[in-house]
């Protein structure tokens, strides 16, 4: 078991290190005309000649917007616009953009040059098709899988890359895996650097910092979990399987009741039998559920998608998990 966990530490650290080196190599000479693709050289020449206004970028999904916000921090010539309310759940964004948010989206799209989407893994993502109605020249940047195919896309739960159903994406959000979050950041920077080459150095610096933070968090968490006596967790939400799988945690077996009134009893039984160190969820539970978890001595860890900084949110969740796994359980708990 120890060897297996040690191998997981080395494998995860290698993956993040590979992405860090790949992104650095990709942008080592962003202004070079010798190595740039013909399309890139043309785009850069046009951008240099016409860059009187900043490059305006649209985003709707909370994780995509939050990640872009971190990458664009301090980047001159780039303006990020959010076209969906900050606290709107992802599954309600398509209806919002097709309804009461459509006029605002159209107004923003007319003045924008790019949109950040997840259409390759989220077919219900309507941001680009709607924005294109207002602006035929707007460019789509799919941050899950690049259109050109020159860089690998993210990996979905189960080892499959590529398209997924809407329910599959919402129930298995790939960005809970730090390697996928790093890939999304790299794909975003790759495309934006080509559209706004003058911002490439700052974008690359922000990407490098994010990669380093994720790599350090994964390394620390993997080492701590390799030394833990047990790795049992309780998943209050099915969508937390991605994080549990990425960290090779051991979810206890229990069935979430369809009737909310039956939840406290079922949860109390699962906590007593499984004795998990951590309870994972994507949203704050009600008071009764939170009290049951506290009384069991399990640590409640919430990883929300509706955050302005998904990188810090994931790092904080990993830190809370490793600290909980290192803390001895109270007697008779």
What does each of the following model-derived ranges do?
Residues 1-8:
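N-terminal secretory signal peptides that target proteins for export/translocation
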Residues 7, 14-16, 36-38:
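Intrinsically disordered, low-complexity repeat segments enriched in small/polar residues
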Residues 2, 27-333:
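Extracytoplasmic metal-acquisition and chelation regions
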Residues 11-24:
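Bacterial N-terminal signal peptides
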